[in-house]
Amino acid sequence: GEPFNAKDARRSMQRIYNLGYFEDVNIKLNPGQQPNAVEIEISVVEMNTGTFGIGAGYSDADGFIGMVSVGDKNFRGTGDKVNIRWEFGGADNKNYEFSYTKPWIDSKETSATITLYDVTNEYADYDRNADEIARYDKKRRGQELTFSRKTNNEYVSNYLTLKNRDDIYK
């Protein structure tokens, strides 16, 4: 093995905690089988990583509206992230977004995320007197593939995103 380094052990403990899968992470040092050796025992307490959200409302303009979202940042215990969001109600409001992230796709800790979406937002333009002069919908439909890798500084990442998106204005 390697010589024990308390600073490296604390950093490893912090990296495990930063994964966001555990409520608590503790390191215990036990005497090793060889003289001047230690065995490191790491104990963790898992946390709930799933999310669920729901919302509803009513307006004169749109009638009943709602939202449902489901996600998990440790999907099936693999560290993968999955999120689904669906909004409904009103004339054109049937928005959805789906994303799936694989945290490590190679030995250099590159992550990959695929996102699919179909979103419509309503906008209004106003003149200098704050009078509405135009109203329009912007529909975004597309897919994205994002690759991410940490730099030498573990708190900084580089991203590369490939997008195929249609923006439609009505």
Where in this protein do the model-derived segments appear?
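Gram-negative/organellar outer-membrane beta-barrel architecture
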Residues: 2-170
